[in-house]
């Protein structure tokens, strides 16, 4: 019988309630770990949230559901929220739903060509996501669009205190060679890349380059748009999951990513509060070492590169 993620979570929740009734602590402990931004030492919670597709909404009922997603993220100690003007209404939705506290760590992107066009787009994005104003946390160059132009603006803005950090992003591994050169020569504060059990090319050179250059790494598409979860949902959770304090496949996939020391924060996207509550549990408890990570890859891919 194939179980949906909702059904799997229901079984896990029932088991968790039983453990609590017996007085045993839940696996993972409940306190989200943090990792430092290498350039400054500022600590970031290790599970954040993306907004591609999920926050591009208009209806009141949809927004209330997303408000609960944010509540689950913050309740667990998460703070990182990533968006882009490419994502439709997502930036505006985030700005509308955020309350006065806790203070999030907000990231968005510039996704246009030209200095003046980039400045106008970034100002609009910052106002949409954080109407309260003040220094914006992280501005990234989306998919390296006109990056040489925007790097100059972002450095000026960082020096002026308009933004706190700047970075680069791309959604395909085909851009990793260029990103590696930018990391080495331009020294961004952040990169955002795809990295997962199924997409591991970043391990070859880009992640080591980020570690050497003291660049923080945000990981997009940790579930490969859900395909990795669909591939495993029919399988029972393996007994070894308990060795890294996991109660779901989603947690295993996220902890596999966090097992790489160069990774700062995966940013799974969801519009389902139950899925967010599940994902954030990967932010606490034991992480897999390198041997355990190889075991996970072998389990899920048959050992294929």
Where are these regions (language model features)?
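Short, acidic/polar
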Residues: 60-73, 115-130, 174-181
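Acidic-and-aromatic substrate-binding clefts and catalytic sites of carbohydrate-active enzymes
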Residues: 56-58, 84-92, 112-118, 142-148, ...
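Conserved, mostly hydrophobic/aromatic
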Residues: 37, 49, 81, 94, ...
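Acidic (Asp/Glu)-rich catalytic clusters
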Residues: 38-41, 94-102, 125-132, 156-158, ...
């Amino acid at each position: 019988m194939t179980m949906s993620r909702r059904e799997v979570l229901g079984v896990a929740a029932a088991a968790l309630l039983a453990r609590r009734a017996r007085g045993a602590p839940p696996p993972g402990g409940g306190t989200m770990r943090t990792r430092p931004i290498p350039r400054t030492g500022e600590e970031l919670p290790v599970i954040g949230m993306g907004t591609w597709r999920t926050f591009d909404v208009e209806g009141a009922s949809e927004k209330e559901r997303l408000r609960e997603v944010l509540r689950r993220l913050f309740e667990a100690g998460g703070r990182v929220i990533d968006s882009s003007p490419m994502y439709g209404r997502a930036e505006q939705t985030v700005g509308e739903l955020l309350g006065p506290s806790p203070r999030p760590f907000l990231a968005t992107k510039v996704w246009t060509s030209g200095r003046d066009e980039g400045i106008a787009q970034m100002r609009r994005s910052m106002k949409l996501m954080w109407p309260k104003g003040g220094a914006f946390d992280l501005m990234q160059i989306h998919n390296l669009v006109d990056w040489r132009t925007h790097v100059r603006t972002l450095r000026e803005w960082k020096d002026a205190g308009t933004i706190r950090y700047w970075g680069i992003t791309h959604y395909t591994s085909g851009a990793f060679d260029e990103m590696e050169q930018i990391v080495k020569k331009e020294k961004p504060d952040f990169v955002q890349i795809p990295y997962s059990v199924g997409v591991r090319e970043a391990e070859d050179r880009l992640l080591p380059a980020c570690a050497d250059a003291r660049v923080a790494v945000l990981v997009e598409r940790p579930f490969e748009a859900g395909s990795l979860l669909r591939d495993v949902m029919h399988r029972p959770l393996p007994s070894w999951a308990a060795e890294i304090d996991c109660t779901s496949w989603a947690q295993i996939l996220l902890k596999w990513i966090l097992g790489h020391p160069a990774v700062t924060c995966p940013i799974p996207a969801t519009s389902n509060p139950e899925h967010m509550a599940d994902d954030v549990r990967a932010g606490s408890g034991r992480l897999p070492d390198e041997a355990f990570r190889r075991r996970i890859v072998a389990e899920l891919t048959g050992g294929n590169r």
